[in-house]
Swiss-Prot record:
Keywords: Conjugation, Periplasm, Plasmid, Signal
Function summary: Involved in F-pilus assembly. Required for F plasmid conjugative transfer.
Effect of loss of the gene: No F pili expressed on cell surface.
Cross-referenced Pfam families: TraW_N
Signal peptide positions on this chain: 1-18
Record's protein name: Protein TraW
Major localization listed first in the record, in broad terms: periplasm
Gene that encodes the chain: traW
Organism: Escherichia coli (strain K12)
One GO location term (cellular component): periplasmic space
Domain of life of the source: Bacteria
Subcellular location: Periplasm
C-alpha cells in the first residue's frame, strides 16, 4: 500500500463495506410504440428545432464550470480560534488486503489502522480559496514534510493554482472534510510522529502560526 491507498482508507470511513447492487430498473412488457422509437422521435424533434444544440451547449458549459469551480463544501466556517485534536484513521475491512506478492496482511472484518503499515509522509492544507486572508496564510506555510497538498473547500481551482504556484485539489462533495471532521478552515492535517493518529489543526488565517 502506498499513501494513495491510505488516503482512500481515510475517505471510506469507519466501516468499509461492499454490496451487491442488483439490477437497476424494472422489466416491462413491450408496448407499441416501443420506447426506443419514442426516444429517437424525441431526439429528432429536438435536433430539428435546434433545442438539442442549445441543451448540449448548456451541458458543456455546466461541466466546464463545475470542473473549474466545483460547488462549495457546505457547512464549512472560518477558523477564528486555534484548536487541534487527534484523528484515528482505523477502518473495518470488507475484504482481505494483500501485498504485491499476494500475501494477506489484513483480513476481512478486522479493524485496521493504515498507519501501522505505511507512514503518512505528507501535510494536507484545507482552505477557502475565495478568502484572500486564507490564501495569504497558505502562502506563508512551510510544510514540515516533502509532500503536501492544498485542498479547496471553495474557490476556483485554476485561479488558486496560479496564485499559489502549486497544484491544487478540491474536496468534491466534502468527502474528506466529513471523514476528518473538518468544519472550519484554514485547517492542517499531519501525522503524529511515532503514533497511529493524525493531527487535525484549525488555524486562524490572521495568526502567524506555521
Amino acid at each position: 500500500m502506498r499513501c494513495r491507498g491510505l488516503i482512500a482508507l481515510l475517505i471510506w470511513g469507519q466501516s468499509v463495506a461492499a454490496a451487491d447492487l442488483g439490477t437497476w430498473g424494472d422489466l416491462w412488457p413491450v408496448k407499441e410504440p416501443d420506447m426506443l422509437t419514442v426516444i429517437m422521435q424525441r431526439l429528432t424533434a429536438l435536433e430539428q428545432s435546434g433545442e438539442m444544440g442549445r441543451k448540449m451547449d448548456a451541458f458543456k458549459e455546466r461541466v466546464i464550470r463545475n470542473s473549474l469551480r466545483p460547488p462549495a463544501v457546505p457547512g464549512i466556517g472560518r477558523t477564528e480560534k486555534y484548536g487541534s485534536r487527534l484523528f484515528d484513521p482505523s477502518v473495518r475491512l470488507a475484504a482481505d488486503i494483500r501485498d504485491n506478492e499476494g500475501r494477506v496482511f489484513a483480513r476481512q472484518g478486522e479493524v485496521m489502522n493504515p498507519l501501522q503499515y505505511v507512514p503518512f509522509n505528507q501535510t494536507l492544507y484545507f482552505i477557502n480559496g475565495d478568502d484572500p486572508a486564507q490564501v495569504a496564510w497558505m502562502k506563508r506555510q512551510t510544510p514540515p514534510t516533502l509532500e503536501s497538498k492544498i485542498i479547496l473547500v471553495q474557490g476556483s481551482i485554476p485561479e488558486m493554482q496560479k496564485s499559489l504556484d502549486s497544484r491544487v485539489y478540491f474536496d468534491q462533495n466534502g468527502v474528506l472534510c466529513q471523514r476528518l471532521g473538518i468544519d472550519q478552515v484554514p485547517a492542517r492535517v499531519s501525522a503524529v510522529p511515532g503514533d497511529r493518529f493524525l493531527k487535525v489543526e484549525f488555524i486562524p488565517a490572521e495568526e502567524g502560526r506555521k
